[in-house]
């Protein structure tokens, strides 16, 4: 069956020479051009109700993460790091009219929550990418900041993803469109990953590595946990699976990276995934960290991304 969008699985990532000019945000949907109005329903924004270029035209960095509270805290942190006016404590949620996602803007940095799992982040990404396109943004870098389960590495380690893989350790995202399965690449920007890793060397006591990230559709059975409401496999099979994942280059597991990599690549966005690990899945299934340790671990990717953004903006002298 022929697709009405035959090129929808072909990346719009520009070549290296294009990076020296302007990188636009592409949308691969011919029907958008003919729409009188585009309502970004889940963000409570729209092309007629809001002046998107005025609101978002200066955005250069988009940071997304699952938790609304964590993304608000990151926005407040960036407000201080960029030394913007005010204390940032009363920062406005741009998406306050909806309870699906939250969004905060601090200078050229946009912080957005995406919920948990592929369906939730994909909805947000569709509308976020359209927002950036309607706002005529260019040279945008998008980074997912998250938590994850590690494989064979110490809790608290930060993993910068070089390749997002599925549950079969393959670098692909399979999207069901109508009654077709469309396979899309999960390639991420390797130069960006290396830049982030180099930034991590300047942050003490934050072990950081580059590795594959496995994306699953489920937190329990899909990640081989023995502590869910359902479990149909043995401890031995679980460990065999996770060890095979490790041998395939996987260093952490989460639930969003494949669709994130696929959609960002298709739309010409320079993208990275940076997640801290909360446990070693070869040792345990449950997260039993104290609150203080959990908070400190969650701040580690934020410190790295803040360092990277300030370097890109030429604000290295403002390192705190």
UniProtKB/Swiss-Prot annotation:
Q: In which tissues is it expressed?
A: Liver specific.
| EC numbers | 2.4.2.3
Picking any one GO molecular function of the record gives: deoxyuridine phosphorylase activity
| Known pathway | Pyrimidine metabolism; UMP biosynthesis via salvage pathway; uracil from uridine (phosphorylase route): step 1/1
Keywords, comma-separated and alphabetical = Disulfide bond, Glycosyltransferase, Redox-active center, Transferase
Q: Give each disulfide bond as a residue pair.
A: 95-102
Protein residues bound to phosphate: 66, 100, 144-147
Ways its activity is controlled: A conditional disulfide bridge can form within the protein that dislocates a critical phosphate-coordinating arginine Arg-100 away from the active site, disabling the enzyme.
Give the induction annotation: Directly up-regulated in liver by HNF-4-alpha (HNF4A) binding to the promoter. May also be indirectly regulated by signaling via various orphan nuclear receptors. Strongly up-regulated by a liver X receptor (LXR) agonist. Slightly up-regulated by a pregnane X receptor (PXR) agonist. Strongly repressed by a peroxisome proliferator-activated receptor alpha (PPAR-alpha) agonist. Slightly repressed by a farnesoid X receptor (FXR) agonist. Shows a diurnal expression pattern with peak levels 12 hours after light onset and lowest levels 0 hours after light onset.
Q: Which InterPro entries match?
A: Nucleoside_phosphorylase_CS (IPR018016), Nucleoside_phosphorylase_d (IPR000845), Nucleoside_phosphorylase_sf (IPR035994), Uridine_phosphorylase_euk (IPR010059)
Superkingdom as given in the UniProt entry: Eukaryota
Q: Answer whether the UniProt record assigns the keyword Zinc-finger to this protein.
A: no
Residues annotated as binding uridine: 148-149, 223-225
Its subunit composition reads: Homodimer.
Return the protein name.
Uridine phosphorylase 2
Its taxonomic path starts at: Eukaryota, Metazoa, Chordata, Craniata, Vertebrata
- What is the primary gene name for this protein? Upp2
